[in-house]
Amino acid sequence: MDYFSMMVSLLLVAFHGAPETAASGTELSTGAENPGEKPPASAPWRPRRSKRCSCSSLMDKECVYFCHLDIIWVNTPGHIVPYGLGSPSRSKRSLKDLFPTRAAYHKNRCQCTSPHDKKCWNFCQAGTELRAQETMEKGRNNLKKGKDCSKLGKKCILQKLMQGRKIRRLEAISNSIKTSFHAAQLRAQLHREQKVTHNRTH
């Protein structure tokens, strides 16, 4: 009997001390009963953050600055922290289905939300070309800075030949990237034209 009276007194103190929680509990229960109701007008409406494109890596600061508009940037020691940078919206998942060639090509740096945004496509394409160009220039600089092989012998000459082959291979890769990008552009344009004519016929 002593245990029962102690429990009742604790419950009375708990409910008497927190009337706000009881009121909010009733509000929650009415909200659960009517899920179709809109929230009150006093609740602030948050607009959706606009993203021009979605970067594959947040470490690529140039891409993050370009793609994520309407973000407050705060400088911290070490790196820049973007506030309001969320996960990409679900609507972007269908981009691979709509434009398979461009999306497959641009997966290295970023993925544009709008297929008609030429600046975005050029930015993503220029990023891959610039990276290839940087690696080629780095290889050329290393080749120029190399040792004079006249006194060092066959091993040095072989190393220089291998570096020259690497540079030529990188140049061939960058040329193939450019040609594949132009081919992908033509395929995407053809796909869009076919889609438009298909929609007009039905």
UniProtKB/Swiss-Prot annotation:
UniProt keyword list: Cleavage on pair of basic residues, Disulfide bond, Secreted, Signal, Vasoactive, Vasoconstrictor
Pfam families for the chain: Endothelin
Propeptide: 24-50, 74-202
Annotated disulfide bonds: 53-67, 55-63
Chief location of this protein within or outside the cell: secreted
Region (Disordered): 24-49
Superkingdom of origin organism: Eukaryota
Recorded family membership: Belongs to the endothelin/sarafotoxin family.
Function text: Endothelins are endothelium-derived vasoconstrictor peptides. Probable ligand for G-protein coupled receptors EDNRA and EDNRB which activates PTK2B, BCAR1, BCAR3 and, GTPases RAP1 and RHOA cascade in glomerular mesangial cells. Also binds the DEAR/FBXW7-AS1 receptor. Promotes mesenteric arterial wall remodeling via activation of ROCK signaling and subsequent colocalization of NFATC3 with F-actin filaments. NFATC3 then translocates to the nucleus where it subsequently promotes the transcription of the smooth muscle hypertrophy and differentiation marker ACTA2.
Protein name: Endothelin-1
Species the sequence originates in: Oryctolagus cuniculus (Rabbit)
